[in-house]
Amino acid sequence: MGPRRRSRKPEAPRRRSPSPTPTPGPSRRGPSLGASSHQHSRRRQGWLKEIRKLQKSTHLLIRKLPFSRLAREICVKFTRGVDFNWQAQALLALQEAAEAFLVHLFEDAYLLTLHAGRVTLFPKDVQLARRIRGLEEGLG
């Protein structure tokens, strides 16, 4: 058996001398406030990076084959079943125009979102943007 511990008599609590520079110890409550905000900003930077990357790019965002099928389907619908042959350059020009229209529409709708004091884009913002644009701007 090891040495026995002596029982101590109750004493007055000892006073600790104040240390000149407190050293931060490990926290038992979880990560500190700074660490959680760092993780939050790192998570937020992911979608911000994606937005900035897409804003800098000039490539088409809608895939060519699904857009081509949609354009042909709409053409067949409005020509009463007559199927036209499409040149690749014609489909590409149509896709460029469609994407430019959508980008401009969403830019206007997001400005309306900010004007309303929100961050989330709602369908009513897109509807109001189309209504403000009128027939000349492609309301249709």
From Swiss-Prot:
Segments crossing the lipid bilayer: none
Residue(s) carrying Phosphoserine: 7, 17, 19, 27, 68
PTM remark: Ubiquitinated. Interaction with herpes virus HSV-1 ICP0 protein, leads to its degradation by the proteasome pathway. Trimethylated by NTMT1 at the N-terminal glycine after cleavage of Met-1. Methylation is low before incorporation into nucleosomes and increases with cell cycle progression, with the highest levels in mitotic nucleosomes.
Alphabetic keyword roster: ADP-ribosylation, Cell cycle, Cell division, Centromere, Chromosome, DNA-binding, Host-virus interaction, Methylation, Mitosis, Nucleosome core, Nucleus, Phosphoprotein, Ubl conjugation
Entries under PROSITE patterns matching the protein: HISTONE_H3_2
Record's GO cellular component terms: CENP-A containing nucleosome; chromosome, centromeric region; condensed chromosome, centromeric region; cytosol; nucleoplasm; nucleosome; nucleus; pericentric heterochromatin
Low complexity composition bias: residue spans: 26-37
Segments for region (Disordered): 1-46
MF GO annotations: chromatin binding; DNA binding; protein heterodimerization activity; structural constituent of chromatin
Comment text on domains: The CATD (CENPA targeting domain) region is responsible for the more compact structure of nucleosomes containing CENPA. It is necessary and sufficient to mediate the localization into centromeres.
Family: Belongs to the histone H3 family.
This protein's name: Histone H3-like centromeric protein A
Species of the source: Homo sapiens (Human)
